[in-house]
Amino acid sequence: MGKKDKRSKLEGDELAEAQQKGSFQLPSSNETAKLDASQWPLLLKNYDKLNVRTNHYTPHVEGVSPLKRDIKNYISSGFFNLDKPSNPSSHEVVSWIKRILRCEKTGHSGTLDPKVSGCLIVCIDRTTRLAKSQQGAGKEYICIFKLHEEVEDERKVKQALEKLTGALFQRPPLISAVKRQLRIRTVYENKFIEYDPAQQMGIFNCICESGTYVRTICVHLGLILGCGGQMQELRRNRSGICDENENMVTMHDVLDAQYMLDTQKDESYMRHIVRPLEALLTQHKRVVVKDSCVNAICYGAKILIPGILRYDDDIEVGKEIVIMTTKGEAICIAIAQMSTSTIASVDHGIVAKSKRVIMERDVYGRKWGLGPVASKKKQMVKDGLLDKFGKPNITTPKSWAKEYVQTDKVKKEQEDKEDEEEEEAPKKKSKKAAKKEVSSSSDSE
């Protein structure tokens, strides 16, 4: 017997002794295992800190985590944080990317002038549905300005920049693609960085509302200082939640990634530069719904209490929220109809109404129309007892016509009644006024 056999035999004996001495059992406990979701991606981050309404639902095989989509869907559900080069316009850059990627649609998060460089969020295919929401997000610029005359002290420049904050009147510059009418735009902060008296040039950082013209701010700065001024260079270093330090890519990256995908079948470069659309929604309050109601929401259904699994704190009525699946996919952007405290305390009602559906229809299976009444209605349509739209015809049994209530018909009748009441209201008021006049005239006589 060799050394190896002895060793294995000894290990076996030790294992047997340990099994006899120890009690290998899972003790019963009321404590639930702690789940650390702080490192989970995108919308699933801090999932364990969401308020739980219920954990009972049937998981569906359909759907997939945003980071595990196949490459075709990954690209069509993604966006770039592009470093726009100086000279080409935003529309030119977007059309070039459309041609490189051979996709159906592209959009961007807000136009940059041809000479301006920096952050430009380029949305691809399905992500273009979020382009409008990103256009309204806040922007941050770094600007180089030039004054036409010398200024005694750079503190005056700093004070003038501080005056140009808050709500400002602006008229678009002469070279602009919009109507030149007076408008109000909010500048949140103008941070003075540097001023060179020899060249009469300075740098400042501007955090402002979308649609603000930094060129106009430079002109106003010159007017306040009494010497005139103009913008020399401009770079956008933040657009919405994307800034220049976070996954910024160039046009060369896009071209190289597509080349690697076409020739080498290498997806890694493309997955590195393209980010899932869910990354644009990480600042929204979240509501997680059951898999069974996902497709209904894609077809325009309202989000009701029975379909809710988890929800965020501090949800306010009328604010935008994101409706998501248990796998972390964004279904739609919705307008909240209930606050967090209301959701926690009620057992029925409308939580939110969808504003913009993001997910395609029929990704998840249909789970409505499976009840006894709906099944009976489908059978009657097959048998010819109802027309193809499910409405009564000559052959429809009288019992069905009495029992079945068409909600759209009832709603229409209610709307007609309300319209009639609105029309009759001024007539009633005029009659009452006429009666009062008659009674007052009789009293005077």
Swiss-Prot record:
Active site: residue positions: D113 (nucleophile)
Subcellular location as annotated: Nucleus, Nucleolus
Function: Plays a central role in ribosomal RNA processing. Probable catalytic subunit of H/ACA small nucleolar ribonucleoprotein (H/ACA snoRNP) complex, which catalyzes pseudouridylation of rRNA. This involves the isomerization of uridine such that the ribose is subsequently attached to C5, instead of the normal N1. Pseudouridine ('psi') residues may serve to stabilize the conformation of rRNAs.
UniProt KW Transmembrane keyword: no
Similarity comment: Belongs to the pseudouridine synthase TruB family.
Domain of life: Eukaryota
Species of origin: Caenorhabditis briggsae
PROSITE patterns xrefs: PUA
EC assignment: 5.4.99.-
Molecular function as annotated in GO: pseudouridine synthase activity; RNA binding
Protein name (Swiss-Prot/TrEMBL): Putative H/ACA ribonucleoprotein complex subunit 4
Keywords: Coiled coil, Isomerase, Nucleus, Ribonucleoprotein, Ribosome biogenesis, RNA-binding, rRNA processing
Catalytic activity: a uridine in RNA = a pseudouridine in RNA
